[in-house]
């Protein structure tokens, strides 16, 4: 008879995974990994930390909700005789709930770029939007110049039209706050259903409005120390260029956003990240590869890459 592993949603940030003690030990090992560059960190050198991050807490039975797919992978692995049992939470529902989004609203959007020219979302953008809304979360991986901000704008547009809670967009730098805001201003210049005045920018040096708007764009540095009560107003969160966030700060913010049902991360790459891939997927959801630079170049949607190698030979006395 298979051993049961019960999974229940604690909130939109965390889930409770419970089973027999021996299984929990396996789960702990499964969700444990070394931090890149841990050998050079003071805590490791001083022998107060072993260099590992343990995502599963066997004491509280808590695990990031975005890692449910990995729990399924663990349970269904060859050689294991485990059975997943999903428990319902009266407020948060089941961990694997999906929706069937109606994307017909996109046809009615009047979108413009920064030059004022009319634009339409591309096929790969529409597929990414469908995936994200269907799962209510996702880590969208798409290269530079692929239109990530347009994907965010359309997802945000849908969310504001179907929900009452506010939306939070987190970026790593102040320049990206302004870039995101200017992109939204361009997209919505002929979109009567989106009011750019309802978008507030928060970063060091910019005063906070007394009345909270529908959308806030902020650097993570400006908000990660705020109390948990401040984050309760948000039902949706976006993390743009999420790979540039510091793991501890990002984790602090996303776990405080326990009532944010919709969680979307975007990034161009998961290589050389400051935050481990499993942490990002745990906080936002499973990785989804939107498109590639090669595909965009093949379709002439991106300038062709021309590589020229310059080989410089120096005399020995200069080397």
Q: What is each model feature region?
A:
Residues 235-236, 243-308:
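Post-DEXD/H (motif II) to motif III coupling segment of the RecA-like Helicase ATP-binding lobe
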Residues 146-186, 250, 272:
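Conserved Walker A/P-loop ATP-binding site and its immediately adjacent core
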Residues 169-170, 201, 265:
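Structural beta-sheet core signal
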Residues 1-90:
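N-terminal accessory nucleic-acid engagement/regulatory domains that precede
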Residues 215-253:
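Conserved RecA-like ASCE ATPase "motif II neighborhood" in helicase/translocase motors
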Residues 185-228:
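Inter-Walker segment of RecA-like/P-loop motor cores
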Residues 52-55, 83-141:
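Conserved pre-motif I regulatory segment
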Residues 159-166, 188-192, 261, 288:
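Post-Walker A helix-loop "phosphate-sensing" segment adjacent to the P-loop in P-loop NTPases
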């Amino acid at each position: 008879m298979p051993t049961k592993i019960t999974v229940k949603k604690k909130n939109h940030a965390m889930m409770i995974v419970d089973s027999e003690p021996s299984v929990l030990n396996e789960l702990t090992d499964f969700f444990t990994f070394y931090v890149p560059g841990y050998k050079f960190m003071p805590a490791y050198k001083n022998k107060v930390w072993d260099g590992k991050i343990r995502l599963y807490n066997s004491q509280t039975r808590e695990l990031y909700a975005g890692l449910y797919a990995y729990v399924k992978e663990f349970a269904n692995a060859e050689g294991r005789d485990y059975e997943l049992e999903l428990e319902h939470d009266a407020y948060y529902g089941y961990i694997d709930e999906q929706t069937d989004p109606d994307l017909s609203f996109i046809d009615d959007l009047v979108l413009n770029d920064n030059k004022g020219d009319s634009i339409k979302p591309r096929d790969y953008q529409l597929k990414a939007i469908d995936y994200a809304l269907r799962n209510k979360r996702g880590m969208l991986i798409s290269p530079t110049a692929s239109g990530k901000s347009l994907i965010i704008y359309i997802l945000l547009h849908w969310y504001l039209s179907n929900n009452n809670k506010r939306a939070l967009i987190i970026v790593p730098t102040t320049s990206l706050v302004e870039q995101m805001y200017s992109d939204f201003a361009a997209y919505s210049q002929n979109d009567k259903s989106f009011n750019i005045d309802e978008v507030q920018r928060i970063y060091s040096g910019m005063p906070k409005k007394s009345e909270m708007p529908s959308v806030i764009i902020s650097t993570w540095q400006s908000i990660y120390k705020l109390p948990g009560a401040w984050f309760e107003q948000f039902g949706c969160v976006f993390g743009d260029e999420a790979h540039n966030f510091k793991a501890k700060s990002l984790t602090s913010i996303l776990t405080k956003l326990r009532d944010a049902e919709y969680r979307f991360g975007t990034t161009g790459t998961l290589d050389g990240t400051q935050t481990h891939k499993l942490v990002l997927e745990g906080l936002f959801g499973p990785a989804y590869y939107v498109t590639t630079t090669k595909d965009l170049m093949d379709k002439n949607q991106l300038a062709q890459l021309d590589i020229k190698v310059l080989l410089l030979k120096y005399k020995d006395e200069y080397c």
